[in-house]
């Protein structure tokens, strides 16, 4: 998708997230970092206003979440977790605090989405992961990318 100052519907990704600002940090280099927690995935149906900013009509995209008793899914998540921690530990560019956060996340959906968001994946891979409705399938695809 082309970058433009005046995007039309066709210039936007149809799937996105609604997020909650968790923290705003003023960094030593005079930049601002914002930590956002994704709440729900949304599908953009159409643009309803363009000025002074874009507004649109959206639908919430429901997640297909495996049951808590699903042992295969639990093993899949643990494998992704282990691979991600190994990747972070071998990286010179990723913060080691991320490994600590990943070790301590117990909610499978938050864990998978945290990994998808925070690893330096290609933009197309992140968009592909965001578009997958099934948490199980998203986790399988993440595992393929990690390998």
Describe each model-derived feature in a short phrase.
Residues 1-147:
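N-terminal low-complexity, acidic/polar interaction/targeting segments
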